[in-house]
Amino acid sequence: MGFYNSGGYSGNSGYSNGFGSSFALIVVLFILLIIVGAAIFNY
């Protein structure tokens, strides 16, 4: 995934461990942004 390589969320030490958590974090933030954006545009 390009997001992880460019971001370098957990660095070299926790690469295998941090991949899943950082990816989940990005997905959750993205979903929250979409929900908030939809709420703002609707009102």
Curated annotation (Swiss-Prot):
GO terms for cellular component: membrane. It is a single-pass membrane protein. It comes from the Bacteria. The chain crosses the membrane at residues 21-41. InterPro entries: YjcZ-like. It is found in: Membrane. Keywords: Membrane, Transmembrane, Transmembrane helix. Belongs to the SscA family. This is Uncharacterized membrane protein YuzJ. It comes from Bacillus subtilis (strain 168). The gene is yuzJ.
